[in-house]
C-alpha cells in the first residue's frame, strides 16, 4: 500500500511539473496592448445581444445553420455537414451608421502563399459594408485539413484582414498563461508587416481580446478582426 501511494505521489508530481513546463508566460509585446472583453449591454439573449468592446459597440452573434453537401465543417467523422452563417454589426467611434458584417463558409477564394499547414479546400469569409469602413474591407480565414486523425491535433488557422491599406495577418497561437488540455483553437495573434500587434485568447469562459492602444492606427482594424473571430463558431471548438 505504501509503495502504491508513493508511486501515485511520484506520478502526481511528474504531471504537475509537466504542466508547469508547458504553461507559457504572456508574450512581452502584449504589454503594449489593451486587454478587453466583449461585454453584453442588453437587447437579447446571450450571443444575440447588444455588446461593447471598449469604444466599439454593436449587436452580434446571429448564427444560423443549414445542411449542405459541401461545407466549412467537412469532417469525415460527422454524417451531417453544416454551413454556418454569422451576422453582426459594429459601430465605429465617431460613426452613426453601423458596419454590417456577414460571414460564411464557402469554397476557397484565398490563396495565401505564406500558409505552411495542409489546408482544407474551404475557407471562412467575411464582408464589411457601411459604417465608415473602406470599400472592399474583407477577411478570409483558411483552416487546416480535417479528418479522424487530424481531429486529435491542434487545429491550425491563418487569415488576412484587408482594411484599406492595412493588411493584418491572423494565425493560431496560444497567447496566455493558462494550460488547457484541449484540442481546440486556443487563440490568435494579429500581425502587420511581421510585427505582432494584437490577439484574441479563446481560453476560458470570457475570451480576452488584446487591441493596440487607443492612439494606434491599427486599433480599428484589429477590433473588427477580433470580433470576426470572436463570433466565428469554429468547428475545431465544437
Q: What is the predicted function of each stretch?
A:
Residues 1-11:
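Bacterial N-terminal signal peptides that target proteins for export
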Residues 10-18:
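Bacterial N-terminal signal peptides
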Residues 25-238:
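Intrinsically disordered, low-complexity proline/glycine-rich segments
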